[in-house]
């Protein structure tokens, strides 16, 4: 869920309303994590009138731990949940998370259903045709395999001829295409990509032996390896050729280009969180310090 998520073709308004309805649930009030965060006057003043006095609606694929998942009371929790609560506090408002299939999140903004896309969504040049991104995270992709690593996987370069799973419509699909081309260019068998609807589906494919490995966002892969089955289900593969993950990129809050005032307000809020130390505190809380950005940029990805 950066899942560094990347949509191969931008979803347009014409996506069926029936599809949106079938892949979304009602709003969920996020467990509050903004205690002690004070309103930033400049950021709050920049928030456009139409977004004041009501919660900001966030489209997000849940679960995608540690970024967003449900606690025992089915309240959304996770780093991105905490961050959005803190952003909202800086703006003097609230947020509501709405569970949405990843490949319909952009369409949900275009239809007016949601205001923000927050789901470990990669800031890509292609997406920038439709959305502006306030970047708050930088991460790559990593592999997890069955615990014990029975196939002795050392990295993408050793997976020629194997089946690797990932989430459909994710950035990792293109990473696997590139790795597969490297295989075939070298006269080896291609990598078979098993693209599945959700993070849970991809995990289950590896556990069931339908895929040798799962390529996911580095932070999610590390968390899954540590937590799933109390650490007994999966193992993180650290590739010596890419110790920090494959093709690191920026992740951000997605906002429709038409809502440039909202983008500016969120950028000011994130900058304030970085300045007052809240941002670093939240990263440390989720053991994600290595994925920090130095400043709140808009559309930081240039190619």
Question: Model features per residue range: what roles?
Answer:
Residues 94-158:
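Acidic, polar ligand-binding/catalytic clefts
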Residues 34-38, 84-85, 89-90, 149, ...:
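Extended ligand-binding regions for polar small-molecule ligands
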């Amino acid at each position: 869920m950066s899942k560094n998520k990347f949509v191969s073709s931008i979803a347009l308004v014409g996506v069926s309303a029936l599809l949106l309805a079938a892949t979304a649930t009602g709003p969920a009030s996020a467990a509050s994590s903004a205690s002690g965060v004070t309103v930033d006057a400049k950021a709050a003043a920049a928030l456009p009138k139409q977004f004041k006095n009501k919660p900001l609606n966030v489209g997000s694929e849940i679960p995608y731990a540690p970024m967003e998942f449900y606690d025992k009371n089915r309240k959304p929790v996770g780093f991105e949940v905490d961050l959005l609560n803190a952003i909202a506090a800086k703006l003097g408002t609230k947020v509501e998370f709405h569970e949405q299939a990843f490949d319909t999140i952009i369409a949900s903004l275009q239809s007016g259903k949601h205001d923000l896309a927050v789901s470990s969504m990669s800031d890509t040049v292609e997406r920038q045709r439709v959305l502006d991104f306030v970047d708050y995270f930088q991460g790559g992709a990593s592999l997890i395999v069955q615990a014990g690593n029975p196939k002795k996987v050392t990295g993408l370069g050793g997976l020629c001829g194997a089946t690797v799973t990932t989430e459909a419509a994710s950035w990792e699909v293109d990473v696997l295409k590139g790795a597969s081309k490297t295989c075939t260019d070298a006269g080896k068998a291609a990598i078979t990509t098993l693209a599945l609807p959700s993070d849970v589906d991809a995990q289950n494919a590896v556990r069931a032996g339908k895929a040798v490995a799962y390529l996911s966002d580095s932070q999610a892969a590390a968390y899954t390896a540590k937590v799933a089955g109390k650490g007994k289900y999966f193992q993180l593969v650290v590739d010596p050729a890419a110790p920090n993950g494959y093709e690191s990129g920026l992740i951000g809050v997605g906002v429709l280009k038409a809502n440039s005032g909202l983008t500016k307000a969120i950028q000011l809020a994130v900058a304030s969180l970085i300045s007052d130390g809240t941002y670093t505190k939240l990263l440390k809380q989720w053991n994600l310090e290595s994925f920090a950005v130095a400043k709140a940029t808009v559309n930081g990805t240039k190619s």
